[in-house]
């Protein structure tokens, strides 16, 4: 197990190195803005129809202990949850093929780049914990001793309290208990968590299933299966369909030949198939079966099915074959993880810079103002103000983060500055005459708190920028040329040194105060 600890350490180093410093992402803002208060709704309110009690509790504790300005702690919580899933996978595989063959399998999952949407994003603690609970319940069934019912109940409680995957986890575990002829011994361990979830559903539950998705289920299930198989080595989807059918045939042969020995195959196949069916019924209209968050849930199950096939040969051969597979998987999906990390950093840079501006202008921002409806659609100025005041911390970038922010992020900050009135440009009543030889072209520096009147020598496009390198479309204005324009810059952040640029070819202007 020392080797596994070293592998986990290397994985942590890689995740931290490629993730860098960023802030909360997309759905996480729903938790930040709506679940920071200590009230029952913060924990029991569903998220996209999922019971999210456990992830909401984890985020709440972190909100209250480390605040909103230490996102690295949230990332660490996500890594630990992912490592728990990988370790449980290792333990289950060890019981079938031994440690030498199990290590490559667990490592392949640990570093699976095509599932980075979960492993690198703390919000997916819910999905990962739900899967971990299922694997813990399977571990309890494998032990099958006097402590197993309690361990199984804990696993199912964790799974149900974390995400919707817990529903199929309960069904899969119940199926295996029945196939093992141990249904009576495990009945309470299954029924108690299921009953608690049902009581929650009666009060808070919602369903996103749509009748029109019924006809889409077969195709969605087929593509989800093939896509998950292909994602293990980042192969084209067409090859995924071929290999998926070959794997299915091999598993059927194994079950037919040794039905009692391969009961786990039935459990795993039924569980993931049920998950894909339920996902199709509720999400097929969005058609994202190849998304990394779905691949993540399927990958350990597919790897355990592969382990079942490997158990048919001697352990030395199994270890060699699985080592080759793991090397293929890690190397082929390595860049996919790096690419997803870059995307997360880019989005985080933009939101962090936008919030830096919003923090400085909350006193003038309308309550319904949204700085970024794409990357952070849940952020409204009033709810954001309440959260940072209530938690006495802000997720906005500090000076160091602002300095290191990308070009695109700084441009997004300019947009928010402009939308919140940091600079205004309007028709002026004052008269100004451009005397020949007094016009200027190019770029003019406008310091904080300044005001000037300008007149272009003809119709021209004016661009404004402060933190960005180029003016955004939102900060471009058409000057008529026959009327003066007044430009006013208010005084807020010291780095807001606005620049006025004449963007039209051969455009010139003269200025007055």
Please annotate each region the language model reported:
Residues 3-50, 59, 63-105, 175-177, ...:
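Intrinsically disordered, polar/acidic, low-complexity terminal segments
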Residues 13-15, 114-120, 160, 198-203, ...:
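Transmembrane-helix signature of polytopic, lipid-linked glycan biosynthesis machinery
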Residues 30, 34, 82, 127-137, ...:
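Hydrophobic core segments of transmembrane alpha-helices in multi-pass, intramembrane catalytic enzymes
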Residues 53, 71, 75, 103-131:
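Aromatic- and kink-enriched transmembrane "portal" helix at the membrane-lumen/periplasm boundary
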Residues 104-105, 195, 259-283, 325-326:
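Transmembrane alpha-helix segments characteristic
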Residues 119, 127, 287-311:
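Hydrophobic/aromatic-rich transmembrane helices and adjacent perimembrane loops
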Residues 134-150:
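Membrane-interface transmembrane helices that cradle and orient dolichyl/undecaprenyl
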Residues 148-164, 169-176:
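Membrane-interface alpha helices of multi-pass inner-membrane proteins
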